[in-house]
C-alpha cells in the first residue's frame, strides 16, 4: 500500500511538475499582461481617434526549446523526485510555488492598474483642448469665451482681431463669424477690452441711428461732429451748433453755412462759382485721365453722404453703404430696389456707365413698336407649351410617385391615365387664364410704365422750346451727367476748357479772358460764320494766345474781313488797330456795367439761376430811332476818335436790307421779351457840348459818305470820354416815332431827344476782380449821316444756353450805300452782332 501511494504521488508530482513549472507559468503571466496592455492601448487609440481601424489577430507565439533546457529539466525532475520522496516536504514546496505565483500576479496587476491610471489622466488632459474653427489651433477651454446669442465658439485672439477689423471699417452690425447672429455689445466689450475701440463702436452706432432720423442735421464746421435734432424748423431754418467753442450757424434745408438774405439755390450757386474760380485760377491744377478715373471711383452715399470707393475690378453696380445700409446704384446714385436694373433707367448691372439718351430713346421706340409683335409671339408659344406640357408633367410626377412601391401595375397605369386626362382638360383653361391676365399686364407695362418712367427721369429727351414747339434732344454718349454729380462735372469741364480753347469750334477757355481784334486791313466784308456747337471740342494751341477768325454773315457778297486774336494773358480787347477802343465790361442781372480805362475786357461766364451759361447777342442797326441801350456800356477815347481818318463805316455801305432787317427783327423780339428785367436807377440830361461834338462827327462822316475806303470801327464810334458810362434803357415806340419825325426834317439836335439814361455808380476805380460774374456784352456805336440822320439801334438779347465752353462769335455785316438819281435816298443799315455762347 505504501509503495502504491508513493507511485501515485510520484506520477501526480510528475504531472504537477510538468503543469506547474514556475518559468512557464511566469512566461504565461507576462504574455497575458502584455496582451492586456496592448488591448488597452488599442482601446485608447480607438476612443481617441474618430476612424476605427480593423482589428488584426496576433499570431500565437512559438516557444523555442534548446538542448540545454532539456537536460536541465531532467536534472530538476530528478531533484524534485528526490524531494518528493520526503512526503510532506514535497507538498510544502508545491504550496510555496502557488504562493509565489499569486504574488507575481498581484504585482503584475498593480503595474497594469498604475499604467491605466496614467493613460486616463493623459486622455483627460487631451480632452480639455478644443480646436478653434478660425485659426485651426487647439486651445484650452478657458480661451473660448461664451457668446450670448449663439453656441459657436472661437478663440479669444481670433474674435478680438475680427472685431477690430469690423469696427475700423465702421461696421456696427457685427455678426458671428460662423452664423448670422449678431453680437451683443456686452460681449464685444468683454472680448475687446479696449476703450478706444469701444468709443469708435459707440460713435458709429450713434451715427447710424442719427442718419435714419430725417430731422437730424450735422454741423458743417470742420472737425465738429455735433448733430442737432430739430423738429419743426422748416419755417425758421437757422440752426446753431451747441458744442462748446463752435457756435456755427447753418441752414436747416441745405445743411450748409447760414446764408442771410439768400435762398438755398442762390447760396449753392455762389459756393459753386467761388469754388470754380479758385479751381481755375490756380495754375498748378491739372486734369488728366487718371484723376478723372479716380474721381469717378469715389462717390458720396445718396442718404448719409459718406464717401465710398468702388474698386475697378469689374464688380456690379449694386452698392450698399456700410454706414447707413443704403442700397443704391453706382451709376445713377439713387436708392434702388431689386427691379432697378430691369427697368428702363439705362443703368446696367455690370457696365461702367449708363445708357445715353439716344440709346434710351431707341430702346423706348423699339419697345413701343415691337411690343405687340413680341407679346403675340410669346402668347403663341406659351399656349401650346402649356396645353402639351402640363399633361406630360403631371404624368411624370404620378409615375415617379408610384415607382418603387408595392402597387400593382394595373393600379399604377390607371392612376397615370386619370391624372393625364384631367390635366388635358384643365391645361387649356390654365393657358387661357394665364394669357388673358399676362398680356394686359405686359401691354400696360410697355405703354404705361416705360414712357412715364423715362420722361420723369428726363431720359426721353423731349423738351418744350421757347415758343418753338416740342424738341427731341439726342446727346452724345460721352456727355452724360450722372445724377448728383452735375456740378462737379461742370466744374471740371470748364477747367479743362481753360487750357485748350478753340475759337474755331466756338469755345473760349476759362472764366477770365480777353479778345483783341484788328480792323486796320479790312478790305472785304466776310461772310464766313464759325459754326456754333454745344459740345465744342478743345484744341491745344502753342502758348496762351488763341487766334481765330470771326466774321459776320449779314450778306453774301464779301467786301470785308475781320480777324480777331484772343489772348488770355493780355486781357485786352480792341476793335481797331489804329485808334478807337471799346471797353466791354461785365453785365449782371441788375444791368450794372463798369467802364474800364483802356481796352480791357473781362470775360466772365454769365450764368443763370440754374447754373447754366448765357448766350448774348448784340445787333447794331442803323435806323431812325433814339439812343437807348439795353444793359451795355461804351468807353471810347475822344482823342482817338478825333484822330481817326475820314473814311468811316458809312463811307461805302451797299444795300443789305434783307439780312440786316432779319437780324434786327429777331433781336428786337428778344429785346422785348427781356425788357421787363431791367431796372431804371436815375435820369440825367445830355449836355450841349456832347451834342455839338456828335453833330460835328456826323457832318464829317456824311461829307465822305461817297468814298469807298477801308472801313474802321473807330471812325464810327463817338467819344464817351473821361471814363463815363452810359446805361441806356430800351426803346419805346413813341420815342421812335418822334425821332423819325425829327430826322425827316433834317434836325441835327437829335441828342436833345434822349429821354433818360441811367447813371452807373462806381464806374471808376473798379478792377476786373470786382466785376459781377453774371454778364452780358453790349456795345454802343453811333454811325449816321447829317442828311439822313440815322441812329443806331442797340438791342441786347440774352439766351439760356447749356453749353459748357464759352463761344464768342463776332459778326460784322456792313451795308454799303448806293445813290440813285431816279430814286430817293435809302436808309443805310449797319448790322453788328456780338454773340457769346457759353
Swiss-Prot record:
Region (Interaction with CASR): 660-838
Membrane topology designation: Multi-pass membrane protein
Ranges that cross the membrane: 368-388, 424-444
Pathway noted in the entry: Protein modification; protein ubiquitination
Biased composition (Basic residues): 671-683
Skewed-composition ranges (Polar residues): 700-717
InterPro entries per record: E3_UB_ligase_RBR, IBR_dom, TRIAD_supradom, Znf_RING, Znf_RING/FYVE/PHD
Main localization category: membrane
Assembly, per entry: Interacts with UBE2L3 and UBE2L6. Also interacts with transcription factor Sp1. Interacts with SNCAIP, CASR and VCP.
Entry domain remark: Members of the RBR family are atypical E3 ligases. They interact with the E2 conjugating enzyme UBE2L3 and function like HECT-type E3 enzymes: they bind E2s via the first RING domain, but require an obligate trans-thiolation step during the ubiquitin transfer, requiring a conserved cysteine residue in the second RING domain.
Name under which the protein is recorded: E3 ubiquitin-protein ligase RNF19A
Source organism (scientific name): Sus scrofa
Amino acid at each position: 500500500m505504501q509503495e502504491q501511494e508513493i507511485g501515485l504521488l510520484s506520477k501526480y508530482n510528475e504531472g504537477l511538475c510538468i503543469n506547474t513549472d514556475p518559468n512557464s507559468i511566469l512566461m504565461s503571466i507576462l504574455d497575458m499582461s502584455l496582451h492586456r496592455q496592448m488591448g488597452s492601448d488599442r482601446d485608447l487609440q480607438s476612443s481617441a481617434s474618430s476612424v476605427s481601424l480593423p482589428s488584426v489577430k496576433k499570431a500565437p507565439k512559438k516557444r523555442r526549446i534548446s538542448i540545454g533546457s532539456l537536460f536541465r529539466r531532467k536534472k530538476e525532475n530528478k531533484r524534485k523526485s528526490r524531494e518528493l520522496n520526503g512526503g510532506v516536504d514535497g507538498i510544502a514546496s508545491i504550496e510555496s510555488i502557488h504562493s509565489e505565483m499569486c504574488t507575481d500576479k498581484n504585482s503584475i496587476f498593480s503595474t497594469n492598474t498604475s499604467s491605466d491610471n496614467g493613460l486616463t489622466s493623459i486622455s483627460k488632459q487631451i480632452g480639455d483642448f478644443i480646436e478653434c474653427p478660425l485659426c485651426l489651433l487647439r486651445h484650452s477651454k478657458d480661451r473660448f469665451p461664451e457668446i450670448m446669442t449663439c453656441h459657436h465658439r472661437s478663440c479669444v485672439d481670433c474674435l478680438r482681431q475680427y472685431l477690430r477689423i469690423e469696427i475700423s471699417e465702421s461696421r456696427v452690425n457685427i455678426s458671428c463669424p460662423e452664423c448670422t447672429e449678431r453680437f451683443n455689445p456686452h460681449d464685444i466689450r468683454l472680448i475687446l477690452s479696449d476703450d478706444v475701440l469701444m468709443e469708435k463702436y459707440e460713435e458709429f452706432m450713434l451715427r447710424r441711428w442719427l442718419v435714419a432720423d430725417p430731422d437730424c442735421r450735422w454741423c458743417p464746421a470742420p472737425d465738429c461732429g455735433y448733430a442737432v435734432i430739430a423738429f419743426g424748423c422748416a419755417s425758421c431754418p437757422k440752426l446753431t451748433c451747441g458744442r462748446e467753442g463752435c457756435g456755427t450757424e447753418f441752414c436747416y434745408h441745405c445743411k450748409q453755412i447760414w446764408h442771410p438774405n439768400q435762398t438755398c439755390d442762390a447760396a449753392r450757386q455762389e459756393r459753386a462759382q467761388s469754388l470754380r474760380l479758385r479751381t481755375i485760377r490756380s495754375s498748378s491744377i491739372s486734369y488728366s485721365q487718371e484723376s478723372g478715373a479716380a474721381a469717378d471711383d469715389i462717390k458720396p452715399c445718396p442718404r448719409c453722404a459718406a464717401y465710398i470707393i468702388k474698386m475697378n475690378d469689374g464688380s456690379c453696380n449694386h452698392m450698399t453703404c456700410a454706414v447707413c445700409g443704403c442700397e443704391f446704384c453706382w451709376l445713377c446714385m439713387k436708392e434702388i430696389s431689386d427691379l432697378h436694373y430691369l427697368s428702363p433707367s439705362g443703368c446696367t448691372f455690370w457696365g461702367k456707365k449708363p445708357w445715353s439718351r439716344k440709346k434710351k430713346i431707341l430702346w423706348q421706340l423699339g419697345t413701343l413698336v415691337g411690343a405687340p409683335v413680341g407679346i403675340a409671339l410669346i402668347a403663341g408659344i406659351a399656349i401650346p407649351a402649356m396645353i402639351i406640357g402640363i399633361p406630360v408633367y403631371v404624368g411624370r410626377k404620378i409615375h415617379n410617385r408610384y415607382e418603387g412601391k408595392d402597387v400593382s401595375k394595373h393600379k399604377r397605369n390607371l392612376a397615370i391615365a386619370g391624372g393625364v386626362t384631367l390635366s388635358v382638360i384643365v391645361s387649356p383653361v390654365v393657358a387661357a387664364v394665364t394669357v388673358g391676365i399676362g398680356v394686359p399686364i405686359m401691354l400696360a407695362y410697355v405703354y404705361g410704365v416705360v414712357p412715364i418712367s423715362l420722361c420723369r427721369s428726363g431720359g426721353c429727351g423731349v423738351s418744350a422750346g421757347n415758343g418753338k414747339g416740342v424738341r427731341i434732344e439726342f446727346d452724345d454718349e460721352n456727355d452724360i451727367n450722372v445724377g448728383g454729380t452735375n456740378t462737379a462735372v461742370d466744374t471740371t469741364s470748364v477747367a479743362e476748357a481753360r487750357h485748350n480753347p478753340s475759337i474755331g469750334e466756338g469755345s473760349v477757355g476759362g472764366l477770365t479772358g480777353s479778345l483783341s481784334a484788328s480792323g486796320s486791313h479790312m478790305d472785304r466784308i466776310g461772310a464766313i460764320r464759325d459754326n456754333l456747337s454745344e459740345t465744342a471740342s478743345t484744341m491745344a494751341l502753342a502758348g496762351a494766345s488763341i487766334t481765330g477768325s470771326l466774321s459776320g454773315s449779314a450778306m453774301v457778297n464779301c467786301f470785308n474781313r475781320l480777324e480777331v486774336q484772343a489772348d488770355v494773358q493780355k486781357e485786352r480787347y480792341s476793335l481797331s488797330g489804329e485808334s478807337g477802343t471799346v471797353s466791354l465790361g461785365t453785365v449782371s442781372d441788375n444791368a450794372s456795367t463798369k467802364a474800364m480805362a483802356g481796352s480791357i475786357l473781362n470775360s466772365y461766364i454769365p450764368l443763370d439761376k440754374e447754373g447754366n451759361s448765357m448766350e448774348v447777342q448784340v445787333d447794331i442797326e442803323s435806323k431812325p430811332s433814339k439812343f437807348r441801350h439795353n444793359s451795355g456800356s461804351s468807353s471810347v477815347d475822344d482823342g482817338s476818335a478825333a484822330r481817326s481818318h475820314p473814311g468811316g463805316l458809312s463811307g461805302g455801305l451797299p444795300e443789305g436790307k434783307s439780312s440786316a432787317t432779319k437780324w434786327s427783327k429777331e433781336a428786337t423780339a428778344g429785346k422785348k421779351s427781356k425788357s421787363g428785367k431791367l431796372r431804371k436807377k436815375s435820369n440825367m440830361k445830355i449836355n450841349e457840348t456832347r451834342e455839338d461834338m456828335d453833330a460835328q462827327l456826323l457832318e464829317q462822316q456824311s461829307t465822305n459818305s461817297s468814298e469807298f475806303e477801308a472801313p474802321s470801327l473807330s471812325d464810327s464810334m463817338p467819344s464817351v470820354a473821361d471814363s463815363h458810362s452810359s446805361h441806356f434803357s430800351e426803346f419805346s415806340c413813341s420815342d421812335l416815332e418822334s425821332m423819325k419825325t425829327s430826322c425827316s426834317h433834317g434836325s441835327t439836335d437829335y441828342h436833345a431827344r434822349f429821354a433818360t439814361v441811367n447813371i452807373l455808380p462806381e464806374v471808376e476805380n473798379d478792377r476786373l476782380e470786382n466785376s459781377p460774374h453774371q454778364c452780358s456784352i453790349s456795345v454802343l456805336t453811333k454811325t449816321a449821316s447829317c442828311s439822313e440822320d440815322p441812329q443806331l439801334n442797340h438791342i441786347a438779347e440774352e439766351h439760356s444756353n447749356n453749353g459748357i465752353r464759352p463761344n464768342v462769335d463776332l459778326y460784322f455785316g456792313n451795308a454799303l450805300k448806293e445813290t440813285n438819281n431816279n430814286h430817293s435816298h435809302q436808309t443805310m443799315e449797319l448790322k453788328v452782332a456780338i454773340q457769346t455762347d457759353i
